[in-house]
């Protein structure tokens, strides 16, 4: 039996993206990318990236491989793209013709990269599905080379704290977003396309201090709004200007 943790079968971590109903709903959502990913998350991510030329990159929760292909198109030498979902990876491989992108089916919590293997680690809207955030952060730190960067986004804690959605008036207009149980960190059972989608709520404080404790230097904290062009196409996204849907953090491993 191999002792390499990355040759083991995928773990029993949540894999809702392989649910047929969920996957079809998500794929439909991403068509044209006029939703949250295209209107807000990916534009904000690109603003935080270093020059990708010559870098070895790790993409945790790679989904359809959009970032992996972007990184290669902008000069990355190699991209290791990890996702727990076989459906997502099948779609990613179908969209990719590039031998320098390696797709691996693995949960984020069980993937172990080699020490100092990467210059950049990116994770887009995936770590709020992870229970052991501290363990993942520690392994990411170990996987980075000197001056390596970790850039990631998560669903904003004011959204995960009390996932009840907008409070609306009798005509259905959005009035306000309730925030409750903010300091009660832990599991939240939610509905997104299907019932039983598990997320893990953490405070902003925990997201930041866990990075610092692991040895990272925080370089950016952001709560971006949709870009103007997206609002012109999707005026309903104006609600995401009223409360931040996404939290971005960027951190660096010190030179050593």
Describe the predicted segments one by one.
Residues 58-60, 64-111:
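Class I SAM-dependent methyltransferase SAM/SAH-binding core
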Residues 134-149:
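A short glycine-rich, Lys/Arg-flanked "PGG" loop and its adjoining helix->strand segment in the class I
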Residues 120-133:
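A short SAM/SAH-binding and catalytic strip from SAM-dependent methyltransferases
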Residues 214-216, 234-256:
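Core SAM-dependent methyltransferase catalytic element
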Residues 199-221:
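Short alpha-helix
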Residues 2-52, 66, 70, 88-91, 149-186:
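Conserved class I S-adenosyl-L-methionine
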